[in-house]
Amino acid sequence: MSKLTENSFRDVNIAFANELSILCDKFGIDVWELISLANRHPRVNILSPGCGVGGHCIAVDPWFIVHAGGYEARLIKSAREVNDHKAEWCIEKIKNAALKFELQNGRKPKVACMGLAFKPDIDDLRESPALNITRRLITDGVDVVAVEPNIKAHKDFEIADYKKAIEISDIIVFLVGH
């Protein structure tokens, strides 16, 4: 139960940052500046928002508590839902930017998806929201250039060098900061 609790705690804290980033986007507030200001308080440590939560632990373990705990695990369940939704939110933001580019330029953009792993500086793609976002964009017809410096190849699409991706892409999306 201790490991499940640790991972659920981390998931809840990440969900707070992810939900805050969605709200800041809605309100026109710079989430990074807001977090920096809030974190000046000695008892506040808001994490950095991302495109979701992945990996074989944090994205999975909270569900064991939710299923066993039922109604009483509503905060943990809510955090899982927020973090799962963040990838969908990112997909819509990217697709809207691509549509705007197409309307302004008369052609579909090439979109570089930077980072596919579930967290920075690893080669592990398990439960990766960045990988799922990239796959979904490709499925939805977006011209994607996938970049993941920690792997050489992927079975579903070509992995590009980041310098080449920047050179040939119209829109650059940083999903995972390596």
Language-model segments: residues:
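Structural/interface elements that position substrates and couple domains in central-metabolism enzymes
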Residues: M1-H178
